[in-house]
């Protein structure tokens, strides 16, 4: 159920890496998706003036360093730093290093963790088209009533037109 009278907010949205997993589950073609939603790939989130003015922090999507059975990476890094062998801790984050150099690539091994920056209204339209291609029927209207079973589950929804839609799964995407 969707109403043409209720618009969507067309703003840029930042996602997190789990979005990528959702798209894999839905078998969404990444190139098509990025084109349709005017999206870009992001390797982390940048926080400007994080602690002090002019001091930025990038929260990279991914892991820093490689741990092993003996200990976590941070232990090796701290020991190396104490001996003068280690670079900055952030230098061991592939996502952060790629972000700082404005680089990205789909690698066969050591896949970079990433997310997207997208136009929310274009994404809603894209998902609608995908769903309709899979047989989902879009019903124009406004929900004015929600009827529940004795256990509290949704039994059906009533539209402004009087149409009653029953179902087993209802998802509110407002």
Language-model features: where?
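Conserved acidic E/D residue at the C-terminus of a beta-strand in Rossmann-like folds
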Residues: 1-5
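Core beta-strand elements of the Rossmann-like FAD/NAD(P) dinucleotide-binding domain
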Residues: 159-169
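Helix-loop-beta segment of a Rossmann-like dinucleotide-binding subdomain
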Residues: 94-122, 156, 164
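Dinucleotide-binding Rossmann-like beta1-alpha1 core, especially the glycine-rich loop
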Residues: 8-97
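A conserved short coil-to-beta-strand element within the FAD-binding core of flavoproteins
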Residues: 139-156
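Short beta-strand to alpha-helix junction loop
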Residues: 14, 110-130, 138-141, 173
